[in-house]
Structures are given as structure tokens and as C-alpha cells.
Amino acid sequence: MKIYLVGGAVRDSLLNLPIKDKDYLVVGATPEQMLQLGYRQVGKDFPVFLHPKNQQEYALARTERKIGLGYGGFSCHASPDVTLEQDLLRRDLTINAIAQDEKGNLYDPFNGIEDLNARLLRHVSDAFVEDPLRILRVARFAARFHALGFHIAAETLALMRQISASDELNALTAERVWQEVDKSLGGPHPEVFFEVLHQCGALEVLFPEIFALFGVPQPEKWHPEIDTGVHTLMVLAQAALLTDDKSVRFAALVHDLGKALSPKEHLPKHHGHGQKGLPLIKALCTRLRVPNETRDLALLVSDQHQNVHQAFELRAETIVKIFDKADFWRKPERLTQLILACIADMRGRTGFENNPYPQGEYLTQCFLAANNVDIAAIIAAGFQGAEIKQALNLRRIEAVSQFKQKMQTKLPTDEQ
């Protein structure tokens, strides 16, 4: 029985990156032997065991055979006669197919170290096409290691296009797709994840609402990049620079979906695109089973981002109505999230990347003024029942109005 450290831990160690999880491969052992040594079996489809002391995962060496559609359509064969190289052969990328024994010796039958040094994401074998999930994984690795200069090998990208052209992607479960999206949204370059999916044809299959934005023109005055799809990924990149909040990043990604529905005769203008996008966001979130809080913020940003951009032009009554509709009184953090998404939208344009966004501070101060209205004073004044809500609304409007009068700096309307 031989034990090897495999996968991400070896890869990240060679890249001098922090190691998060350690996965071990056991060659030459049976499930019975593992149980006798005190390991606890947790794998259902193939033998994976937890170490009796540190609870790290130890998997028996195995081979896989394609028997059906999707990433789950495999028959696994685990036995003591499966070699290290046979196990590494089934892995997705060469950089993930490097093993290290207990003495620190490296085993690299598919030249993963060479590809690491060349900053190349390359498939191990043509069996790559058998697992559609690998498209999402490669896109995620491309995003994760983008800052290190990694790129996808041309022959691997060709196989990814082959998968996209088949029915395999449709076999992926919503939960698995969202899991990969969620991981990518948490990384430093989520826009690269979607760029790769667009390059290989998977975006059209898995995210048709986002794919539809590419090729849709916008006014060059406000959008020198012109293409709405390009703008969308620029906004996502800006959101990633502004915040680690994955919900804000997702909202940035889908805030302009309605532009794909703009009548051709009206292009490059997109009147009411925020509201037009709401059904598209709902459909996408339902299909992928996006968490409710993430969905709700995305709907809010789509619905209100144009108002936020034009905040200086809004009447006090309109501002308070927006606060009411979004229920910022009970969820003030939502205002911060909305403003962050709007900053990303404003900066996600060629030449606007470093511009200030005074609308954000302005709306924040409007909210603070409105939120400082004392409900107790209204009740003490003798208002009852529905009168309390009406009086509260009027006083909030008055508070915002007074703040607006103090403000002298106004920006011209900036159509996003």
C-alpha cells in the first residue's frame, strides 16, 4: 500500500500558493484494509475514506468508464491493481495530475510541471470530453490563475467547443452549475470564467440570457466599448475590484439583461431595460436555483440602477419611494450593495474605470436623513393607525428635501 498527495495541494505547492485542502490517493489497498486501519468510508460511488485522526480524505486508486450522459455517467473501478498512472490518467488537467509520495518525490507522467511552468491549462487525455463539468472547471481555473498568466491550450479549447456542441452540457444539474459559478464569483477574476464560457460556446447553452448581450450595441458617447456583452464583463471585473460580496458581483453580471430585448429600431438606445430584464433574471435564477438573497439583490439592481445613476435629478418623493420599495429601513445593507453594483456599472466602461461616483454618497446621505426621522415623535403627536405611516412618509420626504437643498453640486445625467 502506497499513499500519495495528489491534485490541487501538489499544484498549489509548486505554484507557491497557500494549500487549502489535501487529498490523498491510496494505491494497492482494499476497502477492507482501510477499514481495519481505522479509516471511515464516506464515498458512495467510489471508495473514499476519512483519516481516523485528521479527517482528511483518502481515495483508493480507480479508473472510470463512460456509461451515460453528464458528469455522473461513469462507472468506477477501484481495486489494488489500479496503478498510480492509471488513476492520474482520469484527471482533467495535467497540472492536476501530479502526485507526491510520503518522501516528497514527485510523479508527473503527463508533464504537468512543464505545463505549470508554461502557465498552460491542458487536458490529460481525450477522455476529457466525456465529462461536461470539466468545461466549468477549466473556466474556473482560467479565472483563478489569470493573474499568474495561465491560458488554455488550443487543443483543450477545441475539446471544450466539442462538448458545448453536444448534448452533454444539458445533463449538468442546476446545483452543480451554480456551485461552479459561485466559486468563480468568489475569485479575483470572475469575468474570465464567463469569457472562457463564451469562447468555447458554453455560455449560449448554460447562460443564454448573458450570451444574448454580445453584439447588442450601446450609445458610443456613454459606452466607448459599444458591445453590451463586453460591457457586462467589464462591470463584473469592476465589481470584483470593489467588493468580495458575491451577491453584488452576480447583480453586476445580470444588471443589463434587458438590453437584449430592446427593439432593433431603437438601438443603440435601451429605454426601460432595467425593468425589461426582471423576468430574465427571475428565469435564470429559477433555472440555476440561485439563492433567494442573491436573486433579490440582482432584481433590485436591475430595477433601480438607472435611478441611482440619475440620483441628483430625482425628487425627494421619488427617492423615499425607492427606499420604501427596497425596504432599506429594515435592510440598510442593501443600499450599500446597490451602490457598489452601480459604481461597477459606471466604471465598467472604456475610459471610465477610475471615475468617482458621487451619486453613491449622495443617496447614502439621503437615506440617513430619512432614517433619522423619529417615529416616537410622530406617535407622541397623536397620530394613530394608518396615519402614522402617512406622517412618517411625509416627514421622510421633507428630511430628504431639506438635505437636497443643502446640496449644491449636481452631476449631468449619465445614461448607463
UniProtKB/Swiss-Prot annotation:
Binding-site residues, Mg(2+): D21, D23
NCBIfam families: PRK10885.1
Binding site for CTP: G8, R11, R91, R137, R140
Subunit: Monomer. Can also form homodimers and oligomers.
MF terms (GO), sorted A to Z: ATP binding; CCA tRNA nucleotidyltransferase activity; cyclic-nucleotide phosphodiesterase activity; magnesium ion binding; phosphatase activity; tRNA binding
InterPro entries in UniProt: CCA_bact, HD/PDEase_dom, HD_domain, NT_sf, PolA_pol_head_dom, PolyA_RNA-bd, tRNA_CCA-adding_enzyme
SUPFAM superfamilies attached to this UniProt entry: Nucleotidyltransferase, Poly A polymerase C-terminal region-like
A Gene Ontology biological process term: tRNA 3'-terminal CCA addition
Protein name: Multifunctional CCA protein
Keyword terms of this UniProt record: ATP-binding, Hydrolase, Magnesium, Metal-binding, Multifunctional enzyme, Nickel, Nucleotide-binding, Nucleotidyltransferase, RNA repair, RNA-binding, Transferase, tRNA processing
Keyword Nucleotide-binding assigned: yes
Known cofactor(s): Mg(2+); Ni(2+)
Record flagged with keyword Metal-binding: yes
Similarity comment: family membership: Belongs to the tRNA nucleotidyltransferase/poly(A) polymerase family. Bacterial CCA-adding enzyme type 1 subfamily.
EC number: 2.7.7.72, 3.1.3.-, 3.1.4.-
Record organism: Shewanella baltica (strain OS223)
Cofactor: binding comment: Magnesium is required for nucleotidyltransferase activity.
Domain notes: Comprises two domains: an N-terminal domain containing the nucleotidyltransferase activity and a C-terminal HD domain associated with both phosphodiesterase and phosphatase activities.
HD domain span: 228-329
Entry function: Catalyzes the addition and repair of the essential 3'-terminal CCA sequence in tRNAs without using a nucleic acid template. Adds these three nucleotides in the order of C, C, and A to the tRNA nucleotide-73, using CTP and ATP as substrates and producing inorganic pyrophosphate. tRNA 3'-terminal CCA addition is required both for tRNA processing and repair. Also involved in tRNA surveillance by mediating tandem CCA addition to generate a CCACCA at the 3' terminus of unstable tRNAs. While stable tRNAs receive only 3'-terminal CCA, unstable tRNAs are marked with CCACCA and rapidly degraded.
Top-level taxon of origin: Bacteria
Other comments on record: A single active site specifically recognizes both ATP and CTP and is responsible for their addition.
Enzymatic reactions: a tRNA precursor + 2 CTP + ATP = a tRNA with a 3' CCA end + 3 diphosphate; a tRNA with a 3' CCA end + 2 CTP + ATP = a tRNA with a 3' CCACCA end + 3 diphosphate
CDD domains: HDc, NT_ClassII-CCAase
